[in-house]
């Protein structure tokens, strides 16, 4: 700019003022242009800062989302493990529930042999008076055999009563007649505890001995009369 002004001063003195004004305008425009970039630079600097903050925010959001996803995965895994543990508990409970019925079955099976063991005794005791009455009347043994079949549950009290009543019986042939009632009565006696529940067994044994006692006494009376 200085060279141009010097040339103008040398060659064109008339236009010096106009040239100076033009130079001033050009310098002012240049300063304005230089000023605007300076003003825009802070804005540009502010914009990258905002952009950086914006980028950091998505990163933080992404981290937060990742943590949330991990938390959800952990929760889902915990939920999945919980149902797995629950079926195990239910299986254990089912096994525990399945085992108690076995115990009653064993208990029911236990009185079976006991009743079966007592049933032959009752059959032998009942067969003794039946044999003594057999020469006199052949109908009484069949009646007596039919009655113990009806009263299978109270075999034990009947055995106790018939032992005391049938002990003095005197016969030399107890083999065949004893085997028949014992073979007929024992399966029925063994079936009774397995088919009847615990509650019904004692109730039946408590209620039914009365009708059993009567035929036992009647049979003893008939035996004594016929003897």
Curated annotation (Swiss-Prot):
Residues 15-27, 49-105, 140-152 have a biased composition (Basic and acidic residues). It is found in: Cell membrane; Cell projection, Growth cone. There is a cross-link at residues 25, 84, 97, 163 (Glycyl lysine isopeptide (Lys-Gly) (interchain with G-Cter in SUMO2)). InterPro entries: BASP1 (IPR008408). GO terms for biological process: diaphragm development; gonad development; mesenchymal to epithelial transition; metanephric mesenchyme development; negative regulation of DNA-templated transcription; podocyte differentiation; positive regulation of heart growth; positive regulation of metanephric ureteric bud development. Keywords: Cell membrane, Cell projection, Isopeptide bond, Lipoprotein, Membrane, Myristate, Phosphoprotein, Ubl conjugation. Residues 173-185, 218-227 have a biased composition (Polar residues). Pfam families: BASP1. Residues 1-11 have a biased composition (Basic residues). Residues 106-139 have a biased composition (Low complexity). Brain. Residues 1-227 are annotated as: Disordered. The modification Phosphothreonine is found at residues 31, 36, 196. The keyword Membrane applies. A lipid is attached at residue 2 (N-myristoyl glycine). It is a lipid-anchor. GO terms for molecular function: calmodulin binding; protein domain specific binding; transcription cis-regulatory region binding; transcription corepressor activity. The keyword Transmembrane helix does not apply. It comes from the Eukaryota. The modification Phosphoserine is found at residues 40, 164, 170, 172, 176, 195, 205, 219. PANTHER family: BRAIN ACID SOLUBLE PROTEIN 1. Belongs to the BASP1 family. This is Brain acid soluble protein 1. It comes from Homo sapiens (Human). The gene is BASP1.
